[in-house]
Regions:
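A generic structural signal for well-ordered coil/turn residues at beta-strand boundaries
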Residues: 16, 26, 81, 120-121
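Glycine-rich beta-strand-centered segment in the early N-terminal region that forms part
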Residues: 21-38, 50-97
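Cytochrome P450 core scaffold surrounding the K-helix E-X-X-R motif
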Residues: 41-48
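Generic structural detector for well-ordered beta-strands
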Residues: 19-21, 126
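Extracellular beta-rich ligand/substrate-recognition surface
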Residues: 6-14
């Protein structure tokens, strides 16, 4: 698949359109065929100067994206291949006290696209 990545921090000229392996959805995950991804100020800042956490380079940004489900990992229910989805900027753990109380918007261990996980500047993302 193709992805837009950077190998060093800097201006937009550091972005490269590259071939990378297509991810496979793990248990409980889906493979999203990305159809749209915004250029977010957060992503621009990460590319230009990094963050408090070091990103493993090369890296794929894209904190906000949408698409359709291309494949289902084992155990996935409630969605079908072809369903259109919008991917929330953070992935809650679903195990902390807040997630268990239905307040996953304040999850204690949420992972964020573009920071802890490669983002949507790619043809496919496992989510």
């Amino acid at each position: 698949m193709k992805a837009v990545r950077f190998h060093e921090h800097g201006p937009r000229e550091v972005l490269r359109y590259e071939d990378v392996p297509t991810p496979s959805p793990g248990a409980g995950d889906v493979l999203v065929r990305v159809r749209a991804c915004c250029v977010n100020r957060f992503d621009v800042s990460l590319r230009q100067s990094g963050s408090r956490k070091s990103l493993p380079l090369p890296w794929t940004l894209g904190v906000e994206f949408a698409g359709e489900i291309a494949a289902l990992g084992s155990g996935v229910t409630g969605v079908l291949e072809g369903d259109r989805v919008w991917v929330l900027h953070e992935l809650p753990c679903l195990e902390c006290r807040y997630c268990l109380d239905g307040m996953d918007n304040i999850c204690e261990a949420a992972r964020m696209w573009s920071v802890q996980m490669p983002g949507g500047y790619a043809e496919y993302v496992s989510a």
